[in-house]
Swiss-Prot record:
Start and end residues of each WH2 domain: 1167-1187, 1207-1227, 1297-1317
InterPro entries the UniProt entry points to: COBL-like, Cordon-bleu_ubiquitin_domain, WH2_dom
Ranges annotated as biased composition (Low complexity): 406-422
UniProt cross-references to PROSITE patterns, sorted A to Z: WH2 (PS51082)
Organism: Danio rerio (Zebrafish)
Tagged with keyword Cell membrane: yes
Name of protein: Protein cordon-bleu
UniProt motif (KKRRAP 2) ranges: 338-343
Gene3D superfamilies assigned to the protein according to its UniProt record, in alphabetical order: Phosphatidylinositol 3-kinase Catalytic Subunit, Chain A, domain 1
Comp. bias (Basic and acidic residues): 390-400, 445-460, 746-757, 1128-1137
Signal peptide: none
Membrane topology classification: Peripheral membrane protein
Length: 1343
């Protein structure tokens, strides 16, 4: 209640609602059910009772079976008829599924019934059981109706509308017309059926679709087409094709673009006629004065695409009357209908220019603005090219009718077109003259080749209404050529052509003028169809800058080509970065070009360039012009104007042009016949020259989207271009494509081979390639005439830039200058695999040096075995120290092959095969002495990384060792990683560690100087190869390797250096025992306990696997001095303590890097050394031997120090016991703990004695334990506390106590005694398994 109140308290009313009783469920349902049951009966009694009253209780039924048997039975009247059938069938063994029941009334009439009707309710007297007829079902199925075959017929009508009708393909088309017309809402009387809307092939109405084999047709309603067709323009009458069926052809239905294309083709064919009326002189663009409807075959739908009219001219211009007169005088008036009449552009005051004739107004303000600065900055010629593009295009845009005479007839168009082309193509002075017709100024005639008079005549019509028909015949011929060239326009519209045009702008105008006039004539014809060719929708493009007439566009293109040629070489400076050089962009980009003020008409002129090549005369003149340009270019390179050229100002297309032209490994030939290619070469040379002075950063900016060239850094003024070329080229070369023996600056080599493992080797390659590049550049210089010295540089730079894997930081830059985007072609240049010629480094390479070609393949260098190279290796050592293990491995595999060939008799003692076990020590010594320096370098470099000796080694001996040294790569990579750290530590500690470890007799010279004596170097070197090269031999800990590592071998270092070298060689040979026997160890060495312990630990490592070349020489010495006679042990025991500090110094640094070098073995080594030290401290080695020998016996006997075999066996047994004792260690008992306590007490006592007693005795025993296996507890395996045996002190009492304890442990009776032993001294807790020694308080083990 409380909860309910809490929840319902806020809304009190809700609580009342919750308590309201639910609505009663039973009231209505119960009566309804009862009512339903009562209603059918019509009374209070149930229906069953009513029926029962009506039924007869029993019925006498006469039954007739299918077999004819008849009988009479009395049946309960309440049985359903279906049940009756089932009972009868079962009674007479019939299948009710195949039999039916028929009922007959007393009158013998059939009685219809339901299967569930009760027999008593029916008046039945007879029941017939008949077999079911199975065929009745088949009869009942209606016969399948074959559907009428119909197909979907696609009906095209109203140009682009479609309808689908399903019709009978077998019915004749005549019968299908009503259906089609109903669907398309046509009048069947005016309908024509065509196969398609292109060919207008009328179909035979008597044939069916199947006969014709079509499922689609075109329906033409003549009533809809005729009226707009006739009303469009009378000019439509000339096309009989379209009126043949009074229907629009397929080309008509494709809209304005399709129409333009169609007319362009047609106009080309018709323009060839000289004086005949041209159907369409220039179909591509429409006069502004004309509506689209005035064009033939133009449907009203196209009216939406009208060009918006340009602004009305602010003042009347004189150019307009000539155009009107021309149009009046034109023989063909229908041509005018097809051309737009552009309103006269607003007259503008003539720009002030140095030219006398450039009083002509510029049609558009933008053009005028650009035009004025151009003229002011340069000579009339120089100023014109940008202006030319502006003028020509502004004229195109604003006054197509006047300037280009687009509104004139074919003749007028030809004449005026030629004049316009001459206008564009002529130098600025001449173009001003030509432009003058647009203005009041009169053109100044200038002497020109054969075409000039005609051009002047054509130019004059603009200024004067008169037009001479003479030029017309020639114009059609030019047009004919143009038509042919037009077909190839799209192919030749590449960015490089625009660059070529730009190049022409830097050349003299005289030769160009002659070419211009010829080209001008050609361009007149091309003007009619050019713009339309690539740009059918010229209107849309023209909207940006105003109306553009195709002829003007053409004129602006080809004239620019010539104008740029005529213009001074300094003209290119005018070209702005923003101006796009792509002629492919067409009219769409003119707005941006004009905005830059430097429209590059020459770039567009390239569209025509290939067309010019079609004409042999024009081509010949172009080649002559190019020859002169080559001569001029040489001057241009040295001219002051060259400084004006900037990469940014060079047309982007020029660089783009370089992409297809320049091959990575090939030098372009000057033999190229095409003007475009020659021009591209010129452009390239010009570009490289111009960019040199202007790029302070020394970077040539490639507009190819390629990395910038960095050669510019090294470039000097033009006279030195070739030299600069060589240096710059060398600098950029990253990958040697061709290797030729040459020398190169080491600094450049270093740049080139920064990331290469062996810089000297790669430098030689870079040298060779650089020289090759220089040679090729010189070859280019010879070929390229004056321009060649510039061009080879660029090419070589491009080659290297393309092939170089590493790009200098400046190469990542990309110029900000605009570059062509329309039609730009991307070329993926795959450099061929350079033929790598192995060059001998001439002493720069040390044996085993790795040479890597640009393909990443390792090239082996043949070592020169001529004589010992000295003082050359230290630098090489530094380089090698940087080598990665992978590089060293590669060097190994590469050099071993070479070295095998070059191995001399000196290498035989060093041969790694076991066959060379026996050899002369003297010979070995001699070989070591001859080649110790390099060997030490190699071994030290690879292994220790320490500059042990600065002397170069003989290549022959080094080759022998190279094989051994290379074996270091067989070592696991994980250890090689630590070798570098070890090498650093070794370098820091080399002064102390190397000499002290090796020989007591000559420690200072060997260690301090860091340069070992040749013999010692050989020993170290040999040791490393030994450990590296024959790991398998030294791996066996149980065999010779263990004794071989004993510190006694140190004696061998002292007296017999050659013998020690022999030992090393024998180690390589693989028979250490023989070397032991053969070597007389007569020299005494004062071993130091620390040294011996250290040697012991390292010997363990070495025995496990001599995979650690990085270990300092201290470790190597035990490896080298493998088998000293055991008789010298006493001497070792007698070793003076004062020498210990020295050894301690040696041992300390070694320990420092020891863990770093051998991580996996290091732990074992530390464990082993700690255990050994513990054993040594208590002189427990002897006892350990005893225990190992007597696992079952508890007595431990002290073996004599002079018995090496006992020592060896003790160590081996300890090792074995360690593995077996591990199991026992897991289980501990109270007695074992007590035993440990006792041992630790004794151990503590021994620790105190250790400080006082000399350790030299123990070191002797320490080496035998070197195996890297888990620390060997000497006690027998049954001893669970294997640790204690390791700790057992040498004292006799401890031994007896130990034996007693062991017996007690075995019997289990000594536990109490052990507990009773008090711990009075600090003791060490030695864990033999973990190799840890801990000083524990006496209370830790209290019982």
């Amino acid at each position: 209640m409380n909860l309910g109140d809490a929840t319902t308290r806020p809304p009190v009313g809700r609580r009342m609602k919750a308590q309201a009783p639910p609505p009663p469920r039973p009231p209505q349902p119960a009566p309804r059910r009862i009512f339903r049951n009562a209603v059918p009966d019509g009374g209070g009694s149930s229906g069953g009772d009513c029926k029962e009253n009506m039924l007869r209780s029993y019925v006498d039924l006469h039954i007739s079976l299918p077999t004819g048997y008849q009988t009479t039975i009395n049946v309960d009247g309440r049985k359903a008829l279906m049940d009756l059938l089932v009972d009868l069938c079962s009674q007479y063994h019939l299948n009710p599924a195949y039999h039916t029941l028929e009922l007959l009334s007393p009158d013998a009439q059939p009685v219809s019934f339901k299967p569930n009707a009760l027999l008593g309710a029916l008046d039945v007297s007879c029941a017939l059981i008949k077999e079911r007829v199975l065929e009745d079902r088949v009869i009942r199925k209606p016969p399948p109706k074959v559907p009428e075959k119909t197909v979907r017929l696609v009906v095209n009508y109203h140009r682009s509308q479609k309808a689908v009708v399903r019709v009978n393909p077998l019915a004749p088309l005549q019968t299908l017309v009503p259906v089609i017309c109903q669907k398309c809402e046509f009048d069947p009387a005016h309908v024509l059926l065509f196969k398609d809307n292109i060919n207008h092939q009328q179909l035979d109405l008597d044939k069916s679709l199947s006969d014709l084999g079509i499922r689609e047709l075109y329906v033409l309603d003549q009533t809809l087409v005729l009226q707009p067709k006739m009303a469009s323009t009378p000019a439509l009458n000339y096309s009989a094709e379209s009126l043949r069926s009074n229907s629009l052809s397929g080309s008509e239905k494709k809209g304005l673009l399709g129409f333009l294309k169609f007319n362009r083709r047609k106009s080309k064919g018709m323009s060839v006629v000289a004086s005949g009326p041209c159907v369409e002189a220039r179909p591509s663009t429409l006069g502004q004065s004309q509506s689209v409807m005035n064009i033939s075959k133009m449907s009203p739908k196209v009216e939406l695409k009208k060009r918006r009219a340009p602004a009305p001219p602010p003042a009347p211009t004189q150019t307009l009357p000539p155009t009107s007169q021309i149009s009046l005088g034109s023989p063909s008036s229908h041509n005018l209908l097809k051309k737009r009449k552009a309103p006269a552009p607003p007259p503008t005051p003539p720009p002030s220019t140095p030219e006398p004739d450039i009083s002509t107004y510029v049609p558009t303000a933008t053009v005028q603005e650009h035009y004025i600065p151009a003229s002011v900055e340069r000579t009339p010629r120089a100023s014109t090219p940008a202006d030319d593009s502006d003028l020509s295009h502004s004229i195109e845009d604003s006054e197509p009718a006047r300037s280009i005479c687009s509104s004139s007839s074919g003749d007028d168009a030809a004449a005026v077109g030629s004049s316009s082309s001459s206008l564009a193509e002529e130098p600025v002075t001449h173009r001003a003259d030509v432009i003058a017709p647009f203005t009041t100024s009169t053109p100044e005639p200038e002497p020109k080749p054969e075409y000039e008079p005609e051009l002047k005549k054509e130019a004059s019509p603009r200024s004067t209404p008169e037009l001479e028909p003479g030029p017309r015949p020639e114009v059609p011929a030019a047009e004919d050529l143009e038509v042919e060239m037009e077909l190839k326009m799209e192919e030749t519209e590449n960015n490089r052509h625009s660059g070529i045009a730009w190049l022409h702008s830097a050349h003299e105008s005289v030769l160009e003028r002659r070419v211009q006039q010829e080209v001008e004539t050609v361009s007149v014809a091309s003007s009619e169809s050019f713009a339309d060719h690539g740009y059918a929708a010229s209107e849309d493009m023209a909207e940006e800058s105003g109306p553009v007439s195709p002829s003007e566009r053409m004129q602006s293109v080809s004239p620019m080509d010539i104008m740029s040629l005529n213009s001074d070489s300094t003209l290119p400076v005018k070209q702005s970065k923003e101006s796009s050089s792509d002629s492919d962009e067409g009219c769409a980009t003119w707005g941006s070009r004009q905005s830059s003020g430097h429209i590059q008409d020459g770039q567009k002129s390239i569209k025509r360039q290939n067309g010019y090549e079609e004409d042999p005369e024009i081509t010949a003149q172009i080649h002559l012009t190019l020859a002169d340009l080559d001569a001029n270019l040489a001057d241009l390179n040295h001219s002051d104007g060259a400084s004006v050229f900037v990469d940014d100002e060079i047309p982007v297309s020029i660089v783009d042009m370089d992409i297809p032209v320049t091959a990575i490994d090939e030098v372009l030939d000057d033999d190229q016949c095409s003007a475009s290619e020659c021009e591209s070469v010129l452009l390239r040379s010009t570009q490289s020259i111009s960019s040199k002075p202007c790029t302070p950063c020394g970077v040539i900016q490639n507009k190819n989207n390629n990395a910038c060239l960095t050669e510019e850094k090294h470039r000097s003024p033009f006279p030195d271009i070739e030299k600069q070329l060589q240096t710059a080229t060398l600098t950029v070369i990253d990958k040697p494509t061709i290797q030729s023996p040459t020398s190169k600056k080491p600094s450049q080599d270093a740049k080139i081979t920064d990331n290469m493992e062996q810089k000297t080797t790669f430098n030689s390659e870079a040298k060779s390639k650089s020289e090759t590049v220089e040679l090729t550049s010189q070859k280019d210089t010879v070929l390229q005439k004056s321009q060649s010295f510039v061009r080879p540089d660029v090419q070589s730079v491009q080659k290297e830039r393309t092939s170089s894997t590493r790009v200098l930081p400046t190469q990542g830059k990309i110029t900000l200058s605009s570059f062509s985007r329309f039609g730009m072609k991307t070329f993926t240049v795959i450099p061929p695999k350079p033929a790598v010629s192995q060059t001998k480094p001439a002493g720069s390479l040390v044996t085993g040096a790795i040479k890597i070609d640009e393909q990443g393949n390792m090239v082996t260098q043949r070592q020169i075995s001529s004589g010992p190279e000295k003082n050359n290796t230290p630098s090489v050592d530094t380089t090698r120290a940087d080598k990665t293990p992978l590089v060293k491995a590669k060097a190994f595999w590469s050099t071993t092959e070479k070295q095998e060939k070059l191995t001399t008799a000196k290498t035989e003692p060093i041969v790694n095969n076991g066959d060379t076990d026996v050899f002369k020590a003297s010979a070995v010594t001699g070989s070591f002495k001859l080649s110790p320096p390099e060997e030490t370098h190699k071994e030290v470099i690879i292994v220790e990384r320490k500059p042990i000796s600065g002397v170069a080694s003989k290549p022959s001996f080094s080759e022998n060792h190279a094989e051994k040294r290379d074996l270091s790569f067989l070592i696991p990579s994980r250890r090689t990683s630590s070798q570098y750290v070890a090498s650093v530590i070794a370098k820091n500690n080399k002064n102390s560690s190397i000499p002290k470890t090796k020989i007591d007799t000559t420690p200072a010279p060997l260690s301090i100087s860091g340069v070992q004596n040749p013999v010692n170097q050989l020993l170290n070197n040999e040791v490393k190869p030994t450990s590296i090269h024959k790991p398998a031999v030294t791996v066996k800990p149980t065999e010779n390797p263990v004794p071989s590592f004993r510190p006694k071998c140190l004696q061998s270092y002292v007296a017999e250096k050659p013998t020690s070298s022999e030992r090393i060689s024998t180690l390589h040979g693989g028979d250490k025992t023989k070397s032991l026997d053969s070597q007389p160890l007569s020299i005494k060495i004062q071993p130091f306990p620390h040294v011996s312990a250290h040697i012991k630990s390292f010997s363990e490592e070495a025995t496990s696997i001599n995979n650690f070349p990085d270990t300092s020489s201290a470790r190597q010495t035990p490896t080298d001095t493998t088998h000293p006679p055991l008789a010298k042990k006493p001497e070792l025991h007698k070793s003076e303590i004062p020498s210990e500090p020295n050894q301690g110094n040696v041992f300390g640094p070694v320990k420092k890097f020891k863990p770093v070098i051998f991580k996996p073995v290091q732990q074992e080594t530390s464990i082993h050394s700690s255990l050994m030290e513990a054993i040594q401290s208590g002189e427990g080695i002897e006892r350990l031997r005893k225990v190992s020998d007597l696992p079952t016996s508890c007595t431990v006997k002290k073996p004599s120090y002079n018995d090496p075999e006992n020592e060896r066996s003790a160590l081996l047994s300890a090792i074995r016991a360690s593995s077996t004792s591990a199991k026992l260690k897991k289980t501990k008992s109270v007695a074992s703990k007590e035993l440990e306590q006792l041992r630790k007490v004794e151990e503590d006592r021994n620790v105190h004695t250790e400080v006082i007693s000399p350790r030299p005795t123990s070191p002797d025993f320490v080496p035998p334990l070197p195996p890297s296996f888990s620390p060997p507890p000497p006690p027998p395996p049954p001893l669970a506390p294997a640790k204690p045996p390791v700790v057992l002190p040498p004292g006799g009492n401890p031994e007896a106590a130990r034996e007693a304890l062991l017996e007690a442990i075995r019997s289990g009776s000594g536990a109490q005694q052990l507990r009773k032993v008090p711990v009075t001294q600090t003791r060490r807790q030695v864990n033999g398994r973990l190799g840890t020694i801990q000083a524990t308080s006496p209370l830790s083990y209290g019982h």
